[in-house]
Amino acid sequence: MSNQPNITHFMNNLENQLGCKLFVRSNRGVTLTAEGEKLYQHVSVAYQHLHAAEAELAMERSMESGSITISASEIALHLLLLPILGRFHKQYPGVRLRLLNHSTPEAVESVKNGLADFAVVTTPLQAKKPLKSTSLMSFKEIAVGDHSFQGKEKPMRLKDLIENPLISLGQGSTTYEFYSKFFLENDLVLSPDTEVETIDQVLPLIMNGLGIGFLPELFVRPVIEEGKVCQIPLKENIPEREICLVENHTFPPSIAAEMFKKMLVLK
């Protein structure tokens, strides 16, 4: 604690530095001069801001407040992120969540520019330094068609399958990039009859007979079991894809973002 001589010494030094009288000393105590009043008004505001910041940081440390911005691709959202978002919100209701719906390239760019705390996206992806990607899970995709494919247990060759109208996510998506490469590896060219913006649009189009499509098995399995669509067995093996966490170590994560990341990695 500061004693009286130390306080007096500090007050004298402050007056010398500012070149004006701040205090009027008398037997009754100390009062502020006009200059002292002006300084006090500014200092008191600064103190209030500092006190509020300390209180806010204390609340963030206790996870009573804070915010997280997550950039996510649609498949990553459906297959991994949604249940974790639910658990996190239930455990830390005071933390605000902001979710950006991006393609993988857009999501990676948002993390690079500091617009998102991190991204949860599907491969293929490019994450160059200072970005870092961590695999969270792998998933398999299958060919899916309407009821006309029911009972066809014999695996089809890819070149025969694509004689049917093909529904796909559009150019610029990692899914389009992935299947372009897969088709080329099998001496074929990806040429969708229908391109859509979101994965949610693929399934209804298949169900209504507009064509066949490739969808994550985890995503479409319940609909197959309900008998609304059919899995089409393929001779060719579709490579597995991954869902990855992308971070930017240039920007230190907030306490809330770090806690969410731990929940995401441990799941």
Predicted regions and their residues:
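Hydrophobic hinge/microswitch elements
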Residues: 103-108, 112-115, 122, 180-232
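A late-sequence structural motif
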Residues: 80, 230-267
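Secondary-structure junction motif
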Residues: 165-186, 253-255, 261
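Short beta-strand->loop
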Residues: 132-142, 226-240
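A short LG(V/I)-centered, amphipathic sequence patch enriched
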Residues: 13-32
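Flexible hinge/capping segments at coil-to-helix
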Residues: 128-166, 170
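Alpha-helical linker/hinge and terminal dimerization helices associated
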Residues: 17-18, 39-61
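Central regulatory/effector-binding core of bacterial HTH transcription factors
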Residues: 65-127, 196
